[in-house]
């Protein structure tokens, strides 16, 4: 058995045609990462505090704290049966915003909430879930590279049709970084096909570029990644991921 890790290889060719992410979510802003989507959204508003589930990516929490917004944590986790009660009892105040997280598309979180502050939802791991597609949140965010076979990418949209932040330009450093990650993805494909045997080569590229993503200035998304998203059948891709999960857990 070949050890191959969790970073995607180039594997979207079998899933071309049909409904794409842009068909499901036609009015979006694209960024180099999910963190950039948070930066753009929080910079677009004057929120003072953001409530974030304690079960969340702490690298992203650290990034948000650097945006001069006070982070408040609340108790939420996958399949939390008490999430509605927990959120509605939070001591929120004017100037707050709440982050909900779609945990793997199987969560109970799509419940209507009786709160008086804006809601952001993170659908990174549930892009094709009914919750994501029928969301009534003020804003939604996703780190696309966590769910799709692409090198980089983040997305922001508003189910309530709020005005989106202005588009940002594509930075040269993002193009260079994406090229490196696509090189790593290509080498990994060759590795899985027994055509390349130096795993450390593409692993080092993944590690190097992962560190670079953390320091990028807010940027738009490169053309190669946009082209992949524009042709990738989101339904067959997500179904394949589900089938892979089932195979791994037999």
Which residues fall in each region the model found?
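A conserved donor-nucleotide-binding helix/loop in the catalytic core
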Residues: 37-38, 100-112, 138-157
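A short alpha->loop->secondary-structure connector
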Residues: 120-121, 140
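Glycine-rich beta-alpha loop elements in corrinoid/cobalamin-binding modules
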Residues: 124, 128-131, 136
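Active-site region of PLP-dependent enzymes
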Residues: 128-129, 139-142, 146-153, 157-249
